[in-house]
Regions:
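Immediate post-signal peptide segment of exported/extracytoplasmic ligand-binding proteins
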Residues: 45-63, 81-82, 151-157, 313-320
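An extracytoplasmic/periplasmic, membrane-proximal ligand-sensing/linker region
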Residues: 59-62, 69-73, 221, 279-320
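Short helices/loops that flank or line small-molecule/ion binding pockets
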Residues: 79-80, 92, 97-111, 174-175, ...
Length: 320
């Protein structure tokens, strides 16, 4: 990344044209000065990558897209990054469909809002190559209700709202199956849809809605499967959830949340530094506390994340 261009006021007035031997001297000095400036620009570009910005003091600004800007862990990570000369600028998105296109179009430098399965679906659907550069946590996907206090209280033919994006929808169906509320044909998979529900063998009916609207749907349904960030933003108490999947199990691998970059920036040292800072004790504790203790920290090598992503992309392509 090159430094921002200077304005016209920064260009010094040219002296009278020199004569004689001074011409060669001035030319040599000018060439040397240009060489130094070019070398500095190349160094800054190497350190900051193609999207972030470096100021005159060498501080780097990195734009990170998220859907949970209000989470209490962000100030902790932002302060820690600032100590390393990295100024994090958060860009909040109101739903899950916006942050990956924004990253691909270089409107932001990184994003942190999604798990690997969501990323796999995006890459396949959009023929994209966004890639994980660091893991963070796995959070449960839980069932909440304003009308019932236990799964057993949900009546036959009760209505359950679930997220309608493919990855969270499939996970929600698996959660409901684990809770004994429905059955999926063939046992279901990470790509299950409402069409896979065995209605004759199921107790409830599902209603897909936008993930951001699952909380708002609570008064009109028996229960809703709600993503952790939306549940916390709505001040729902995770301990009052009727049911949730177990983020510590191996089956949770597709749901590892990750920092994501463009493929060209996957080795950017500034971006990788931010991903590493997440696992410092103070930052990690803040993230887990922000989830009300529901999140499980995951620190997997990037090679593992790339392997899991490649496998999930293969599964998604096969389904299409």
């Amino acid at each position: 990344m090159t430094q921002p261009p200077t304005g016209p006021d920064d260009v010094p007035a040219l002296p009278d044209k020199p004569t004689g031997r001074r011409t060669g001297l001035v030319t040599a000095v000018s060439i040397a000065a240009v060489a130094v400036l070019v070398a500095a620009a190349v160094l800054v570009s190497h350190l900051t990558g193609t999207g972030s910005r470096a100021d005159a003091a060498g501080r780097v600004t990195v734009k990170i897209g998220t859907t949970d800007q209000s989470s209490d862990f962000w100030p902790v990570l932002t302060r820690r990054a600032a100590e390393e000369g990295i100024d994090i600028e958060l860009v909040n998105f109101t739903d899950y469909t916006q942050a990956n296109p924004a990253l691909a179009q270089k409107q932001i430098d990184l994003n942190l809002f999604q798990h690997l399965l969501f990323l796999a679906n995006h890459n396949v659907a959009d023929h994209d190559t966004l890639t994980p550069i660091g893991s963070t946590v796995v959070v449960p996907l839980s069932l909440y209700s304003k009308k019932h206090t236990a799964v057993a209280q949900i009546p036959r033919d009760g209505r359950i709202a679930i997220p309608n994006d493919p990855t969270n929808q499939a996970r929600a169906l698996l959660v409901l199956q684990q809770a004994g509320l429905l059955k999926l044909k063939g046992g279901g998979s990470v790509l299950a849809t409402p069409a896979d529900v065995d209605t004759a063998a199921s107790k409830v009916r599902v209603t897909p809605v936008d993930a951001a609207q699952t909380v708002a749907s609570l008064p009109s349904v028996d229960a809703a499967v709600i993503n952790n960030n939306f549940a916390l933003d709505a001040a729902l108490d995770p301990s009052k959830a009727l049911y949730g999947d177990d983020p510590s199990k191996p089956e949770a691998e597709p749901y590892i949340n990750v920092f994501v970059a463009r493929a060209a920036d996957k080795d950017n040292p500034t971006y990788r530094k931010i991903a590493a800072l997440y696992h410092e004790e103070a930052v990690k504790k803040a993230a887990i506390d922000a989830s009300k203790g529901t999140a499980v920290a995951v620190d997997r090598p990037r090679a593992d994340l790339e392997r899991i992503l490649a496998s999930l992309e293969k599964t998604v392509r096969a389904a299409h």
